[in-house]
Structure formats: structure tokens, C-alpha cells
UniProtKB/Swiss-Prot annotation:
Key enzyme in the regulation of glycerol uptake and metabolism. Catalyzes the phosphorylation of glycerol to yield sn-glycerol 3-phosphate. InterPro entries: ATPase_NBD, Carb_kinase_FGGY, Carb_kinase_FGGY_CS, FGGY_C, FGGY_N, Glycerol_kin. The lineage of its organism: Bacteria, Pseudomonadati, Pseudomonadota, Gammaproteobacteria, Pseudomonadales. It holds the Pfam family FGGY_C. This is Glycerol kinase. Inhibited by fructose 1,6-bisphosphate (FBP). The gene is glpK. It comes from Pseudomonas putida (strain GB-1). It comes from the Bacteria.
Amino acid sequence: MTDTQDKHYIIALDQGTTSSRAIIFDRDANVVGTSQREFAQHYPQAGWVEHDPMEIFATQSATMVEALAQAGISHAQVAALGITNQRETTVVWDKETGRPVYNAIVWQCRRSTEICAQLKRDGHEAYIRETTGLVTDPYFSGTKLKWILDNVEGARERAERGELLFGTIDTWLIWKFSGGKVHVTDYTNASRTLMFNIHSLQWDDKLLEILGIPRQMLPEVRPSSEVYGHTKSGIAIAGIAGDQQSALFGQMCVEPGQAKNTYGTGCFLLMNTGDQAVKSSHGLLTTIACGPRGEVAYALEGAVFNGGSTVQWLRDELKIVNDALDTEYFASKVKDSNGVYLVPAFTGLGAPYWDPYARGALFGLTRGVKVDHIIRAALESIAYQTRDVLDAMQQDCGQHLSELRVDGGAVANNFLMQFQADILGTCVERPQMRETTALGAAYLAGLACGFWSGLDELRDKAIIEREFSPQLDETQKEKLYAGWKKAVERTRDWEDHEA
């Protein structure tokens, strides 16, 4: 605990896949200052995605300064800083100079597909699943880190000499903001690395040996809500959670059976399972989340690789919309998609398929298909993929969700939210506070330093802005969904690969 009597604000840093943001909250969890900066995406080869870690730090630092200036407050009035981040994205840097040895390898990047295939051939898949709760997929940090050590000249030798450090983005930012004094991560981020035992809550020696990772590179793993250190300007760094776990906490889904979907670049559906690490038989991940006080809890997660990025593709590559916000208007102009299905498997398929060799496709094209139908099919694909995951999740947990809480940029799209409720047959609740990912990090930081007293105080701040109720009948719903399943099957195993 720290003395927060004269400090009236919490800063949340929300380091995402395409932008860095800073959001300042007051004691009533109102937003009083924000700033956002986009940064460059690098695609050196097909299926590869990289970021510049120094640009991430620079944009994140700038947004903090800008948000404080916008709010008209000083560092001295800030009780604590919480960080939430794009997960799995992997940074390796020099301990002395603080310079990365390679670009950050982003969660979307598929370059370690062959490393994963070799792990499977060597018979490690079951152990990885049992120990980490994850599937053997290029999505997670461990094989990205192995790729850097294997492919960057001198990296492995330097890592073994203790000269290099590894971190996910939270770790990298805290190391930079603390002036190189603090090398930590939290349980939620560690659980996404493919190197962490989610049952013993330790780095797993056998997995480190399998991947060839020197243990001394790894950060210390700590709870999501505690004071880890201070920035150079003296602000307590007091909360960390991976973006999806942070959103789950920000939505107050802290009890078993509560679930949310975040619609961002990808879509992420998490269900809190309390102290039970539920094993999925449907290709979902078992991961670590935050309990009522930020302590370790478990969750089931389904990840959809391409959600909002599908709309970005319509805008930036096909150029059939000028602004993502316009998609609601165009989709609503037509009564249905005219039989068109868009499967956005640009980087393979995530849960529950886990097919890195699938590729995107448009199905059902006829001469009567207009641009509006394709735009509508793109939005519908986000809802269909969410249903894929939610169906699997409900079967694993043996219970039916009465409602789904939603957040992320795309929830502003009323067409998408209504179609989501229709295709699920479940109410969709959209909160008044849209910044739930940042809010979760702020809550974790505020609880750690005594800024907020506890969960009851936070629950009072959660207001539902609009509820979308299902309007499709069962026959229509299932006919549409059957068409989607048929389309997905046609995209599977498209890329050539070794067996």
C-alpha cells in the first residue's frame, strides 16, 4: 500500500497491436485524459509480423506525457500506473545497452510454424498442453524466442552468458520505464509464453530445455496487482495484465461462469473458471486470469486471429470502405449477405480449429453480389467466429451463458452487435465504459496501492449502456451457421506444408 490521499488519478497504459494508448482515470473511474499513437507494422515475409520495440516504447512514453497534459495534471497527482499489453509478442534485448537484438515478433506472426511442427513430431504436444494449458502453435512466445536465439547471429551465446533479457511487452515497458531496474512479468502474461507451468506457477524446466531457452533471460513472475517498482519520475508501477485478462477484470467477470468478448484486431472470448483449470476438449486454451483481488484465477479462452483486421483489410487493401465506421451503414443497406461468406483466415485459423495452413476465401459469389454484401459478410464473419468459440466453451464448462459482455473498438457497430446476439441466441451487453481493457489495468493498479478499497466499490461503477437481444428464429440461425461451417471447411489445409 502507498499513501494515495493526495493523489487522485490512475494511469493505464494500453499497449496494443497497432497503437499505444494512455488513459487517465479518476476515483469514479471516469476518463479524464487520453492519448493514442499508431506505430509501424513490418511484414518482412508472407505470414511474418514485426514491431520495433523502441518505437513501441517511444509512442507509449509520448502518450503518457500527452494524456497528462490533456488532463492538466502532474506526475505528483498520479497514484499508480497500470500496464496492459498485446500478449505473446516477444522482445529480446541487451541488458547493458537496453537495445533490442531484433524486432519484436508479434503474436500474429507465423514464422515459427515449422518449430511447432517439429515439437509435435518429437512428441512434446501432450506435455505442452498439460503444463501450459496452451496448444503447440506459433501464436505463443516460446517458439518465437527460440527462433530469435536460433537465427540472430550470436544471440544464443550471449543469452547463455546472461547478456540478454527476454520479455513480453509488459516486461519490456516496465524495464524501460524503471530505468532498467525491474525485470518482471505477471502470471497472466507468463501463462502465454509456452514456457510456464500454470499449475505450479513456475517457469517449467523441462519446457525450457525442450526449447533451448536459458532460464536467466526470463523475468520474475509476480501477481497482477502489486507494486513492482517506480518510473523514473516516481510513479508506482502497480498493475499488469495481458490485454484480454485485463478486459475480463475491467468487465468485472471475476466469478466462475462470467464471460466477455473483446473485439479488437483479433477477437478474444474469455470465461472465468475460478480456481479450476478446466481442460478443454474443443481446442480452447486454459489460461490464467485475475480473481476478485487480482490473485491467480483460471479462464478458458478462444482466440480469433482476424476480427477488426478483416475490416482493416476491406479499407486498406480492397479500398471498398473509407472508414471502418462506415461498415455498419453498408451492411444495413442489404437484408442479408446474399449467400456470401468471407472466411478471414489471413494468418490461419485460431480456436477451435488451430489450422496455421488455412487461408482466407470468399464463397458464394454470383453476379448479383454487391460490395454491400461483401462488407456485410466481413462483419458477419466476426460474429460466426465468436460463435465457434462460445459453442466450444459452453460444452467444456457444461453450462449455458445467459449473456455475453462485450468490449473493444468494434462494439460501436450496432449491426455487428445485433447479428452477434442473433447468431448466438444470447443477449449481448455493451457497457457504458468502452475502455474496459485499460480500466482493468487501472483497477489492478488502484487496488494494489489502496486507491480503491475493493471489488464492491468497483462493481458500482459498471453500467450497461445497451443490451442486444436475439431476434432470429432458430431455423434461420442454424441455416446461416451451417453455411459458415461449410465455408470454413473449404479453407482448411490450403498452404503446402510438410506432413
